[in-house]
Amino acid sequence: MPARMTYCWSMSKKNVSLGYIAGYWGSGPPAGALEAIKEADKLGFDSAWTAEAYGSDALTPLAWWGSHTERIRLGTSIIQMSARTPAATAMAAMTMDHLSGGRFILGLGASGPQVVEGWYGQPYPKPLARTREYVGIIREIIRRDGPVEHHGEFYDMPYKGGANLGKPLKSTIHPHRKEIPIFLGAEGPKNVALAAEICDGWLPLYFSPKEDAWYRERLREGFAASGEEGKEDRFEVAIPLTVVPGDDVEKCADVVRPNLALYAGGMGARGANFHFEVFARMGYEDVALKVQDLYLAGKKAEAASIIPLRMVEDVALVGPIDKIRDEAAKWRETCITTFLVGGPAPMLSRYADMLLG
């Protein structure tokens, strides 16, 4: 069995590992995903991840692809909390953990009001408070210490009203592990701190090494609030990292620009686009505003074209291989513990060489 691909960095005595991310589907299943995940497992990648938004779900492909693996951890990045009740998510997590032999990671996220209210038909009030309550119920169900009775601001178990016949229940299956790792997708400062307080890992979507100190402070706030000694040493941070090698830096950046335009400009309404706010904190608010204006006006290609190279290079690795290696070394010194990469199976060993040295 191959050893886990890691790079040890001394500041927090953690390892930087590689994971594979398949993301959510476009019009259909991504070509070559099964082969890539099998190759990642063979190469010693730490984890493989799926996602969902308002198309493919995260759990079904993860179970299918994961059934062809032996050791790689299997995670969701992310499951939409509004898509399932806490009980349904806990059931899925326990089932996946049994089927994988204790390799499952439950990655959750609140998403945004456009998706939650538009697709899942639920209100989007107080996402932080709802997340805290949601995670707490899941942990209680998985521990299986007794029948679950919870009456909170967002969830009633048993439900009060209706036929008035509900009763506290305990899961019929016993957990493979009483503590399944829970990661939280988060971008805002309070949500990042919440991840550090109540979860076992954080799943940012965009990250820049120049923002590392700011994020570390948010994480420290959460660690302190958790009251758990040594949590910082156990906590994981897994980031999807786009890597585009090539001699022409601008052409490599052109591969990344449409994705940045989509998220900064179109993935959320004005005033409620959390990805936009990430780039604004990085110092690109003026650019992001122009991108948003163009994208929402239907000028997607033009929105992508105005994204400067420095904005791409802040969140992705593009250009000649030596340049990528040098910049990856800076990324390894941040709070990130896992680089999540995508792409075809033959590229994975090259990613390992470029990113881990």
What are the functions of these language-model segments?
Residues 7-76, 180:
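N-terminal beta1-alpha1-beta2 module of alpha/beta enzyme domains
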Residues 59-79, 83, 130, 134, ...:
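Alpha-helix-loop-beta-strand connector modules within alpha/beta enzyme cores
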Residues 28-39, 92, 186-197, 256, ...:
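Short, acidic/polar
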Residues 44, 65, 96, 138, ...:
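Conserved, mostly hydrophobic/aromatic
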Residues 56-62, 208-223, 349:
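Active-site-adjacent beta->alpha loops and helix N-cap segments on the catalytic face
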Residues 16-22, 48-50, 74-77, 104-108, ...:
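Hydrophobic faces of well-ordered beta-strands that scaffold small-molecule active sites
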Residues 12, 125-173, 212-330:
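An alpha-helical appendage that flanks or caps ligand/catalytic pockets
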Residues 17-31, 79-86, 177-187, 243-244, ...:
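Active-site mouth loops of central-metabolism enzymes
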